[in-house]
Regions:
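A short, structured loop/turn motif at beta-sheet edges
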Residues: 114-122
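Short, glycine-anchored, charge-dense loop/turn motifs used at functional sites
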Residues: 176-182
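Surface-exposed helix/loop patches within compact recognition domains
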Residues: 10-115
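Boundary/junction segments of secreted and surface-exposed precursor proteins
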Residues: 1-17, 162
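Edge beta-strand at a domain terminus
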Residues: 1-5, 110, 125-146
């Protein structure tokens, strides 16, 4: 088991998933962000070095480079080895019945952007690569209501919203679209 040599990652987490933000800023200048899929099939762990904790969204807004400097304003690049606990600790991994699967990713370069969404809640976006330069793109959005929820105009159509793999999509007259109107049929 090691860093995945292939298989680009495109993953979205939402408030439907298990999200935990742990504040260690007072003792270690550290914030740990953990996201585990609702069905417990995969998990991501990010270590943010920060001297402050944002009481509204947890992690202060900004762009955090992924590296090994341990400096404030960065995210720890994963070496994959937790020597203290004698364990393998990837940044993103798959699980099945509590056991690791072969597909693991160790983020070694890139960045994590933290911002507030339109509802003022946490929006996190990872653009990284692992040691094999496999592209990794992960988004977490804490959700919140938007003006779109109550809009109803024009003729009635066979249209509904659906959540697929953590991504909000629109099914209209049998065709699947993303939120900007792109046809998702590939």
């Amino acid at each position: 088991m090691g860093d995945a040599s292939e298989g680009d990652v495109e993953r979205t987490y939402s408030s439907q998933d298990h999200i935990q933000i742990t504040d260690y800023t007072k003792t270690n200048s550290l914030i740990i962000f953990e996201a585990e899929s609702e069905v417990e099939s995969d998990m991501m762990v990010l270590y943010f070095f920060s001297n402050t904790f944002d009481n509204q969204i947890g992690i202060p807004e900004g762009e955090y480079p992924i590296n090994s400097s341990l400096l404030p304003g960065t995210v720890l690049a994963s070496t994959g080895i937790d020597e203290e606990n004698n364990a393998v600790t990837p940044s993103l991994y798959s699980t099945f019945d509590g056991e690791y699967l072969d597909r693991m990713y160790f983020f070694v370069d890139g960045s994590v952007n933290i911002s507030k969404n339109d509802a003022g809640k946490l929006h996190l976006e990872v653009n990284a690569v692992n040691s094999y330069l496999v592209p990794i793109h992960i988004v977490y959005d804490a959700g919140g209501t938007t003006d779109v929820e109550d809009i109803h105009k024009g003729n009635n159509t066979n249209t509904q919203k659906m959540l697929l793999n953590g991504q909000l999509l629109i099914l209209r007259n049998g065709t699947l679209y993303d939120l900007v109107g792109r046809n998702m049929k590939k």
